[in-house]
Amino acid sequence: MRGCLQSVKWLTSALRPSQSLASSTRYPRRLLSTSAPRNAQVRKPASEVEQRIAAIPIERFRNFCIVAHVDHGKSTLSDRLLELTGTIEAGANKQVLDKLDVERERGITVKAQTCSMLYNHQGEDYLLHLVDTPGHVDFRAEVSRSYASCGGALLLVDASQGIQAQTVANFYLAFAEGLKLVPVINKVDLPSADPQRALDQMKNTFELDPESAVLVSAKTGLNVSQLLPTVIEQIPAPVGDRTKPLRMLLVDSWYSTYKGVILLVRLFDGEIRAGDQVVSFATGLKYTVGEVGIMYPGQTAQSVLRAGQVGYIYFNPAMKRSQEAKVGDTYTKVGSERLVQPLPGFEEPKAMVFVAAYPVDASDFPHLEDSINQLILNDRSVTLQKESSEALGAGFRLGFLGTLHCSVFEDRLRQEHGASIIITPPTVPFKVIWKDGKEEIITNPALFPEEDTLRAKVTELQEPFVLATLTFPEEYLGRVIELCESNRGEQKSLEFFTSTQVILKYELPLAQLVDDFFGKLKGSTKGYASLDYEESGWRRSNISKLQLLVNKVPVDAVSRVVHSSQVQRLGRLWVSKFKEHVDRQMFEVVIQAAAGRNVVARESIKPFRKDVLQKLHAADVTRRKKLLEKQKEGRKKLKAVGNVVIEHKAFQAFLAK
């Protein structure tokens, strides 16, 4: 075995550096997989890179990220910057920092990715560290963590679309972190581009100087070369002292099959090398460092990481449990605990959307469990609980930050792990205030109190609300207000920030938001609207549990807590849709939707009818009555003791979007 490994090592070392680099960039690494590619180090001439980095003082470090709305060109601009600095080959790469299949398919960034770049400006080398952050509200935890490791940001706006909801939200996140913002207008090459409008919006909305803006086209590379000198001149260098005791912030982590948990870290003070012993302030656990390095663009080992740098480390022996890597934790060297003040951490993201996931085939449960656990190693914001359903068997209740987060996770389960799953519609948590003063948050509709308990022991029921910010052209204002009002919204503000664009703020129930509100909004505005939201607390609400009953027996997999205004509509929809997928039986099947004790909708499936009168003489009336009566009694008995057989595919079809 050792001989095999040595021969592989000999083969890889025999490759010319240019060959190795070309192959690694032509087939970009999927850095978030738990398989080998993330662990494979990029074979660059490390000594040359390391010598250049060693000669650069902290005053010539720049840590920056790109702040933008979804689809405004962050990942494409990142590619151009990596090409410009020679980190990757020009033209051979598409979205180098978007590693996941789902990111490339949807054109979105899900995980924050990082890369170090070396750039010579006016005869001096600079070490630039770029973070490509997600733009969507569901991945805000990724965004805020990334900002903590940066000193400035490029505020990117699409010249054809102008400022959008998530541009505003991400601007305020970056502003709150104290980042220096450089305005950049992208896609100026488009026929529909209006750079002046975008500059005016930046000035009016964010009070940014239009004179300092850089107008670029990330796709064609136009003016991109002006960006890096602007970054160097306008974004401040990180502050740190390499002679002080180590103070290191954990920004992110991912799991490797071979190396255990790998940590992405930002050094504020001191330096770290392989062999150093470090201790976590959050857990008190001690580790020996196995390797340190930078992302260039893959893992590139270094002999040392210094104050001001962002890089990766892993331990030897390995950190095996990803739960030990608490994002926002501070590490220092063993013996320096009393000399170092821990850095302020990050707020843990709270799951706000819940679904149940079941395998289509019950025998696939172990595979599904293994697949979910592997994905959760790289996404700690997902919550996981085992649950069981009489109808669908063993499964899991999963909690997500939002509906896109949920949808991306589902896509990754199917694409990366080949999972065949049934996913229930998304639900939101509800708060129960009991008469004895206790409060309980319920995330599973099956655990919602029954009617008798509600009347006897519950004081109040509450549901979560969000403050939604919607931006869209003025011509769609009437339709959008109508949509928000029909979804139990309450208008908070209306603002015209250009002659044609509107910013509308509404408080909406989260339950309405996850019920395809964004899809309806896009339909009402022909795709021109954007949406961002933040939590707005809990409010008293008239809610009840809606259940589906088959022959008066509740189907546990299909229950939902809804507002009283939605009960009738949803109940009728459920029974008519479920009827389409249930096969006829030897007895009548009654499908009902019930809220508490009230049946709000009903459908019946007629039984198969055996002709018991086939052999009778037409005149034999008494015999005819007797046989029909007997058949009727037999059906009653069968209905009383018989179980309705509902195929798995019926649930699959019913729960399908």
Swiss-Prot record:
Its EC number is 3.6.5.-. It is a peripheral membrane protein. It is an enzyme of class 3 (hydrolase). Promotes mitochondrial protein synthesis. May act as a fidelity factor of the translation reaction, by catalyzing a one-codon backward translocation of tRNAs on improperly translocated ribosomes. Binds to mitochondrial ribosomes in a GTP-dependent manner. Residues 59-239 form the tr-type G domain. GO terms for molecular function: GTP binding; GTPase activity; mitochondrial ribosome binding. This is Translation factor GUF1, mitochondrial. It is found in: Mitochondrion inner membrane. Keywords: GTP-binding, Hydrolase, Membrane, Mitochondrion, Mitochondrion inner membrane, Nucleotide-binding, Protein biosynthesis, Transit peptide. The keyword Aminoacyl-tRNA synthetase does not apply. InterPro entries: EF-4 (IPR006297), EFG_III/V (IPR035647), EFG_V-like (IPR000640), G_TR_CS (IPR031157), LepA_C_sf (IPR038363), LepA_CTD (IPR013842), LepA_IV (IPR035654), P-loop_NTPase (IPR027417). One of its GO terms (cellular component) is mitochondrial inner membrane. GO terms for biological process: positive regulation of translation; translation. Its main location: mitochondrion. The lineage of its organism: Eukaryota, Fungi, Dikarya, Ascomycota, Pezizomycotina. Belongs to the TRAFAC class translation factor GTPase superfamily. Classic translation factor GTPase family. LepA subfamily. GTP binds at residues 68-75, 132-136, 186-189. It comes from Ajellomyces capsulatus (strain G186AR / H82 / ATCC MYA-2454 / RMSCC 2432). HAMAP family: LepA (MF_00071). CDD domains: EF4_II, EF4_III, LepA, lepA_C. It catalyses: GTP + H2O = GDP + phosphate + H(+). Residues 1-39 form a transit peptide.
